[in-house]
Amino acid sequence: MGRMWASEVLLLLLLGSSRAVTPGLDVSTAPGLDGSIPPGLDGSVSPGLDGSVSPGLDGSASPGLDGSVSPGLDGSASPGLDGSTPAGRDGTITPKLEGTITPKQDGSISPSWPWRWPITYLDAILAAVRLLNQKISGPCILRLREAQPRPGWVGTLQRRREVSFLVEDGPCPPGVDCRSCEPGALQHCVGTVSIEQQPTAELRCRPLRPQPIRNWWIRIWEWLNGIRKRLRQRSPFYVRGHLNVTSTPQP
């Protein structure tokens, strides 16, 4: 009786050890010859030894454990779950569908459209001087003498801004009759500049003459030259037109 009990216990131990040693079906996937791991039955891909995940058949890559997405073969990266796009290797940001530009890592913002570029006060005045030379009639070429700063230009959100500057008659070009020109004669121009998709300006200019000392010989000289002065005298004029604004290089 004791021997039969011992043999039954030994048989049970042998059966239990055989079940524990016998291997089941291996559901793990062995890597291929090139080191890549094919997807499992559910389409998921296990990460490699270095933690990287190979892209799928459509070229997309699943986010890593930290939520980051590696760029594709062309350097592009798919947007994240919140719609944002990570910065490229050079720090540039791809514009979104609505046209907005995200600042770069250094804080600067790339221009989206030319009419949204930052226009300085000097850029607007130089464009206004070019407009004057296009609109006025005569051989005289005006050039900028002084740009008078206007308060509220920097940081303002208004599209229409005030300008004030002085222009003078430049040297006479060779081969041109410039008898009606007075090199160095000043004119004071004021007006507004509209910063829009097509910038425009409304300017009013008037001659700026120095006030002479009222001595008797000055009065005689003015009387003798009165006719010549009246023939060459200029009247205030009004100019309105589109501006061709070009940004000046920043130092």
UniProtKB/Swiss-Prot annotation:
InterPro entries (UniProt xref): Cathelicidin-like, Cystatin_sf
SUPFAM superfamilies xref list: Cystatin/monellin
GO MF annotations, alphabetized: lipopolysaccharide binding
Family the entry assigns: Belongs to the cathelicidin family.
GO biological process: antimicrobial humoral immune response mediated by antimicrobial peptide; defense response to Gram-negative bacterium; defense response to Gram-positive bacterium; innate immune response
Gene: CATHB1
Tissue and organ distribution: Detected in bursa of Fabricius, in filamentous structures surrounding the basal and lateral surfaces of bursal M cells (at protein level). Detected in bursa of Fabricius, in secretory enterocytes of the interfollicular bursal epithelium, but not in M cells.
Domain of life: Eukaryota
Subcellular location: Secreted
Signal peptide: 1-20
Protein's recorded name: Cathelicidin-B1
